[in-house]
Amino acid sequence: MARFDFLTTPIAGLTLVQRLRLEDSRGFLSRFYCADEFEAAGVQQSIVQINHTLTRCKGTVRGMHFQLPPHAETKFVSCLHGEVYDVAVDLRKSSSTFLQWHGVLLSAENQCSFLIPEGFAHGFQALTDDCELIYLHTAAYQPAAEGAVNANDPRLAITWPLDIAEMSDRDRSHPLLAAEFEGFEP
């Protein structure tokens, strides 16, 4: 029995993953990840790092982060508590959707995860207080390979659902994309 539905999005490579939730009087069981099922769906990368975040304030935006090659990473993002609007921006140089973004709603209730391949910037906005996310990464964090773009970059024109209540100084200071930005190949 399949425990996941892999749903396509308007941007090639971005996938919304719906986890099957089995419930009874005791509660529920939801398979979070299965390498065999992901491989059968064409996702064949090993998880090497897992991060867990808490965002306390509704309206907070985190992002937009990525890692440059040769440390580019795929992220599998899930919400364990609360609700977030999760966004990925296509930075792949040769992509027909270069600089386009796609957002999805992730929550503990909807049992969805966002599979974001190499070559995308990632960020989110907390839609409730005390949001907890878990990220599965296919590459370890490498500070020298870290990249970011400003979540309010007018060239991206991301439509955040709420007014931005909080953003770290670091995220707020990420650069706007220069007109000559051509992306990169993961």
Can you say where each PLM-predicted feature lies in the sequence?
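Short beta-strand His + acidic residue motifs that chelate non-heme Fe in jelly-roll/DSBH
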Residues: 114, 122-127
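Compact nucleic-acid interaction/catalytic patches
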Residues: 124, 133-134
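Non-catalytic, conserved peripheral segments adjacent to functional cores
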Residues: 1-112, 130, 137, 142-186
